[in-house]
């Protein structure tokens, strides 16, 4: 059984899902995937069902009745990963390749000594894809504010590419 499950919230990601799942399932460490689809009209949910049938126990498709938002998609995915699948590590990422799956083995290795690993956009070697200047500006402002007000050391407190240890 997979110890690490990747939660991938989706809405209209039919153009990306097959390639993303191929890359995730080809990684070492027997990665599992939980696709949380918000009733995508482009067939993303049906694609997730197909993958679930091909890889039972490694791919799960969760279907929600409407576009309910990213936060609740993560909650649904975490509930599945923790309470039903028994994942030891849970990773969150976007389906649009703004987070590169090739970094996941490094994140897993780091998680052996850290409880949370953040795939930061704002460290040497990091970067952004598919983001407008306004979104990057707002993200940097939010991160600066979080560090200043809360004393956080993390460079990218708003990153969606994260790995959490269950414990």
Language model region names:
Residues 1-23:
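N-proximal low-complexity "stem/linker" segments adjacent to membrane-targeting elements
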Residues 6, 33, 61, 90, ...:
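Hydrophobic/aromatic residues located in beta-strands of well-ordered beta-sheets
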Residues 8, 30-40, 62-63:
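Short beta-strand/loop segment that forms part of the nucleotide-sugar
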Residues 15-19, 42-51:
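Acidic helix N-cap motif at the loop->helix transition within catalytic regions
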Residues 22-31:
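Short, acidic, metal-binding catalytic loop of nucleotide-sugar glycosyltransferases
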Residues 37-46, 66, 97:
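A conserved acidic beta->alpha catalytic loop
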Residues 64-81, 101-167:
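Acceptor/aglycone-binding surface of glycosyltransferases and processive sugar-polymer synthases
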Residues 86-98:
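Short beta-strand-to-loop acidic/aromatic patch adjacent to the donor-nucleotide binding site
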């Amino acid at each position: 059984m997979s110890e690490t499950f990747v939660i991938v919230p989706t809405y209209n990601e039919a153009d990306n899902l097959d390639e993303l799942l191929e890359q995730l399932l080809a990684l070492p460490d027997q990665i599992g995937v939980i696709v949380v689809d918000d009733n995508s009209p482009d067939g993303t949910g049906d694609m997730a069902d197909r993958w679930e049938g091909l890889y039972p126990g490694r791919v799960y498709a969760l279907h929600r009745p409407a576009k309910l938002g990213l936060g609740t998609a993560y909650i649904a995915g975490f509930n599945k990963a923790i309470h039903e699948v028994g994942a030891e590590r849970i990773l969150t990422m976007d389906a649009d390749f703004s987070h590169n799956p090739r970094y996941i083995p490094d994140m897993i290795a780091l998680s052996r000594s850290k409880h949370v690993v953040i795939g930061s956009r704002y460290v040497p070697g990091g970067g952004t894809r598919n983001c407008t200047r306004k979104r990057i500006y707002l993200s940097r402002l939010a991160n600066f504010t979080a560090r200043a007000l809360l004393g956080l050391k993390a460079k990218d407190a708003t990153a969606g590419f994260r790995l959490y240890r269950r414990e």
